[in-house]
Curated annotation (Swiss-Prot):
Gene: ureC
The organism of origin for this protein: Frankia casuarinae (strain DSM 45818 / CECT 9043 / HFP020203 / CcI3)
This protein's name: Urease subunit alpha
Subunit structure, as described in the record: Heterotrimer of UreA (gamma), UreB (beta) and UreC (alpha) subunits. Three heterotrimers associate to form the active enzyme.
Binding site for Ni(2+) 1: H143, H145, K226, D369
Residues that, per the record, bind Ni(2+) 2: K226, H255, H281
Cofactor(s) annotated in UniProt: Ni cation
Lineage: Bacteria, Bacillati, Actinomycetota, Actinomycetes, Frankiales
Keywords, in A-Z order: Cytoplasm, Hydrolase, Metal-binding, Nickel
UniProt modified residues of type N6-carboxylysine: K226
GO biological process terms, semicolon-separated: urea catabolic process
Amino acid sequence: MSRLDRSRYAALYGPTVGDRIRLADTDLFIEVTEDRSRGPAGTGTGDEAVFGGGKVIRESMGQSLATRAEGAPDLVITGAVVLDHWGVVKADVGIRDGRIVALGKAGNPDTMDGVHPELVMGPGTEIIAGNGKILTAGAVDCHVHLICPQQVPEALGAGITTLIGGGTGPAEGTKATTVTPGSWNLARMLSALDDWPVNVVLLGKGNTVSDESMWEQLRAGAAGFKLHEDWGTTPAAIDACLRVADAAGVQVALHSDTLNEAGFVEDTLAAIAGRAIHAYHTEGAGGGHAPDIITVAAAGNVLPSSTNPTRPHTVNTLDEHLDMLMVCHHLNPSVPEDLAFAESRIRPSTIAAEDILHDLGAISMIGSDSQAMGRIGEVVLRTWQTAHVMKLRRGSLAGDDRADNTRARRYIAKYTICPAVAHGLDAEIGSVEPGKLADLVLYDPAFFGVRPSLVLKGGFIAWAAMGDANASIPTPQPVLPRPMWGAARGPAAASSLIFVAPAAIEDGLPGRLGLATPVVPVADVRRRGKADLPENTATPDIRVDPDTFTVTVDGEAIEADPVSELPMTQRYFLF
């Protein structure tokens, strides 16, 4: 029997069990723990599905006679290393009707052993070569200010396929508060987003004690609420909003009271009263009770997230935040009270603790805060920069030895499955699993987390790193992230989802607005807690000294030690 050494096999088919892959230029490595592309127990080793001249996927060889009507997949991604919250495996990934059908071995069972019954390729099957590449779920940005439509291509180019947030454009309310308020604005924004290849979750305004005003927004397409201090996040407003959310089954995102005008963090937790809530920028630089909002990450009912400008803590983090705050919250640096408000939110001690809490899995999600103290194109990148810094500082996590699979699974969950679970989207998106929408991102390992090779939306290529369109082949420079056919109006809508409250479906919203994008209800999230967020369930004791702002986690004081150098930076970007 002919044999291949490990390096030759990897060159032909991609890495297999026991091979390690470096993530971009970080110090993080993942190791393949299972190779499903070789069939059960390796029964198909030697005839792995590979496309090209003289290769396997040809008529009566790797390609069978199966028609689409007989179940052949529409698309197979061959030999990709799937990195998800549940593991690191190599597999052929089959897609049909825009959804993942199986992870296994693709091929022709008439000529090949170990072919998965859902991955029998026929003449109607398209192929993407994932060999040697990393495949992840599309990112879910859980904190988006919809300030301008140009954010969408930036997001897609960074591997983001779902946007959770709100806004109406560059209005002062939107620039500050992630809210699409009222039925008229919701209808306009749903119509505007109908043509884009992204899934959408709009948040209505929760800062009111009027139940009917909140129900009106739910019937009009809001899939949850945002409570923001700029609209007045009082204990009464928190309680009223959560009462309606409990009845409607939707999530509430919280930006609490930085100035402690209506109460302190203890009062906010008392108003929440053990109910599920998504705490935005839990560290506090983005807003929230100063100086100790970070302590809410210890509560099991609080689903905590970060926004990316504080990820990770660097020597530049503090300096850029003051200017960002002034712009985003309509403050005047010549007014002493405005300056004090801004300075109260920027604390090196809590930013340093945020790093540690992410590595422990105590802060569970990362979003952007797009154009409102955050960058929509850097959610994925800054997540992995944080993981890199934490490995350097804290060493390998328990369970990691030759590679960093445990840490990688924890960090990828922060922008995929965890926000999907928090907002009731996980039945549809958030992971690479059969039955879910095929929102997938394919990376060359050297560019992992920096620049995707392909972004699939509902199983159709929407964005790609593409060379000169007038060239004779696809690869000549300049290679730029560009829209593909899946970003065109028809397939963009057909391949995406608009998530709304169940009340909107019951009220006939889809027919009333005439949207091309399928409209689906969010799942009831009111009984969900941090224990439901994969790989990010920790609830350590967190305390903040009110005088020095020193943070202790399970009794250990966290020292601020900002880094001066990061991976995934100048090696990849000119600016």
